[in-house]
Amino acid sequence: MPELPIHPDGGREAPGYALERRLTRLEGLLPAARRRRAHQGLRESSVLETLRLTGADAAEKDRESPLFDGALEALALIETTASSGKELDLGLIREVHRLSSPPSGGEIRTRDLAPQFQNARILSPRFIESRLQNLLDWLHGDSGRGMFPAERMALWFPRFIEIAPFERGNFRTAHLFLSFFSCADGYPPVSLKFEEAEAVRGEVERAFLFDTGPLVQRFSSALGRAIEALESAGGEGA
């Protein structure tokens, strides 16, 4: 991994290195059955938080609802694709959006939208696909691959929300895809928490002005929570 500090501050170690060490310690120590159970719990937790963050509170009480099932299928597709080493592409984005935001068919929007975040500059529909492709090219290029997962998340999340490729459900799709960047580097699925919503809004608005530091820290904490869930699973029955 790169020697790329998240916040240059006189030599303090970047959080990404500490997370890597915790993940490495778990390799070979967590029995396969426990790992599978822990991963499934993280998937379900990520979907629930995604739906809560986007106003679908009822899904928390009904894990067999079509909305929950669709989002869980979308997250499984994200995890499988990322873990196989494939790159994130427009086709995957559209399919994940279709699964997680019914009745959308995954179509790119054809009309202008009003911004829902301060400092956001929503694109005209004719620029959406080219701007999305530019973002993906950067994330999968040499610079993007040289970043810690939390740093890639902090670039992806606000830019996708600002591009807003769909008429609705952009935040939901952006949030589900955070797990692409964690799973691509061997981490489990991740999610923000509903209780963080107000703070996250402010951090996203700062990121529109290229101040991504707070979001990097936020996503580092999310990765830490996911690893902690695996560590707890490893301690079961010890």
What label would you give each PLM region?
Residues 1-238:
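FIC/Doc superfamily catalytic core
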